[in-house]
Design a protein with these regions (language model features):
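Fungal secretory targeting signals
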Residues: 1-25
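Catalytic cores of phosphodiester-bond hydrolases, prominently lipid phosphodiesterases
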Residues: 19-307
Length: 307
């Protein structure tokens, strides 16, 4: 009877969440004991927009951050967003053009992330990579993840897409060793690379590149078959300023007002504006420029129910 019970428990844990059961159990998850029993789909994470675009040069118009990837993670960022392009035969993190801002090789970026994860074994991290050139997942993206050592840490859900309410707990992800969730905006069809998940089938976004500090909310990008309320959602809480208001204009990240944009009051107002579209749920990801400025982590703690 005991053998049968053990078999049932093992099968249940593997089948429901796609996670192997281990004897250890995390007691602190993403810095909080309370988060160990919290579903990934019911947790809010601090995010970094164009996380690779790091510079303190005020004339670097393509910058969005001013502290390193490691420093961002040390500040509490657990959602890293980055856009990639094939340039000069290599996959590099760049936005629009690598001439405008070259964030370096994707594999080098991932190696930095892997080093940080190795030093912080009780952390769940999400990566959102955008793939406007539709670079091959199997031939280009997967080798970068493999070479960096990140692939063994990636989580593959038992169903794709996965409903917001069906995700495992942070504790389960950490205990399993599968604590990196990877989403991609375009080209993630699962063919041969099952750990790169289609973003818009599981996460919806409000409009991006906002120049309005009120961040009016609407469902701007998502895909079926899941309902909007079965999606997770993120806040594109990064403000832009039009520096050449002619034609389509030229938008750059608004550093001058970063403290106001990244304040608790601004973030909470944005979250409140999107909540009616998400069945009253808090956002899963709060994506900011200039994560070292303002009160991003304080707002995320509040959204997670911690005063």
């Amino acid at each position: 009877m005991n053998l049968l019970l053990s078999f049932v428990i093992l099968a249940f844990g593997t089948a429901v969440f796609g996670l192997p059961l281990t004897s250890k159990r995390a007691t602190i998850c993403n810095g909080r004991a309370e988060l160990c029993s919290r579903s990934y789909g019911n947790t809010t994470f601090l995010g970094s927009h164009n996380s690779y675009a790091v510079s303190t040069d005020i004339f670097a118009v393509g910058r969005n951050q001013e502290v390193s990837i490691t420093a961002q993670l040390d500040l509490g960022v657990r959602f890293l967003q980055a856009q990639a392009h094939q340039w000069e035969g290599n996959l590099r993190f760049c936005h629009t053009s690598c001439i405008l801002f070259d964030g370096g090789l994707v594999v080098d970026y991932l190696k930095k992330v892997k080093s940080w994860l190795d030093a912080h074994p009780n952390e769940v991290l999400t990566l959102l990579v955008t793939n406007p050139d539709n670079v091959s997942l199997r031939d280009v993206w997967k080798p970068a993840f493999d070479s960096s050592g990140v692939t063994p840490l990636t989580y593959v859900p038992p169903t794709n897409p996965m409903k917001r309410g069906d995700w495992p707990t942070l504790g389960s992800l950490i205990d399993s060793g599968k604590r990196v969730i990877v989403f991609m905006d375009s080209g993630a069809d699962g063919a041969g690379v099952d750990f790169i998940l289609p973003q818009f089938k599981m996460i919806w976004e409000p409009p991006f590149s906002s120049t309005d500090p009120n961040f009016p909310c609407s469902v701007d990008r998502n895909e079926g078959p899941l309902s909007v309320t079965d999606h997770m959602h993120m806040l594109n809480h990064n403000l832009n300023v039009n520096i050449i208001p002619i034609g389509d204009g030229v938008l750059v990240a608004d550093r001058a007002n970063a403290a106001r944009t990244n304040s608790v009051s601004s973030i909470m107002a944005n979250a409140g504006g999107c909540a009616p579209l998400a069945a009253g749920k808090a956002p899963n990801f709060v994506m900011l420029d200039w994560v070292n400025v303002g009160e991003g982590m304080k707002a995320v703690n509040m959204l997670n129910g911690f005063a």
